[in-house]
Amino acid sequence: MRKDIHPKNNLVVFKDGSNGAMFLTKSTLNSKETIKYIDGKEYPLVTVEITSKSHPFYTGQQKFVDAAGRIDKFNKRYKKS
């Protein structure tokens, strides 16, 4: 087997951009940003848009997206004459 062909796994903190929740896990991602985690150690920080702490499927809080205006516009445009 060849050595040094696989990416290196490091401990990385993923931070939810919408609510600030943080997760410490192993990842091959790296970042120049660092953050001091709960355990007092400093880790690379990767900010993500959405995680299980903010996604409606996992939180149980469904958000209604108002698509009525777009549907009406579509029906008006393609209405049979």
Curated annotation (Swiss-Prot):
The keyword Ribonucleoprotein applies. Gene3D superfamilies: Ribosomal protein L31. Pfam families: Ribosomal_L31. GO terms for biological process: translation. Keywords: Ribonucleoprotein, Ribosomal protein. GO terms for cellular component: ribonucleoprotein complex; ribosome. It comes from the Bacteria. One of its GO terms (molecular function) is structural constituent of ribosome. SUPFAM superfamilies: L28p-like. The keyword Transmembrane does not apply. Belongs to the bacterial ribosomal protein bL31 family. Type B subfamily. Part of the 50S ribosomal subunit. PANTHER family: 50S RIBOSOMAL PROTEIN L31, CHLOROPLASTIC, LARGE RIBOSOMAL SUBUNIT PROTEIN BL31C. This is Large ribosomal subunit protein bL31B. The lineage of its organism: Bacteria, Pseudomonadati, Spirochaetota, Spirochaetia, Spirochaetales. The gene is rpmE2.
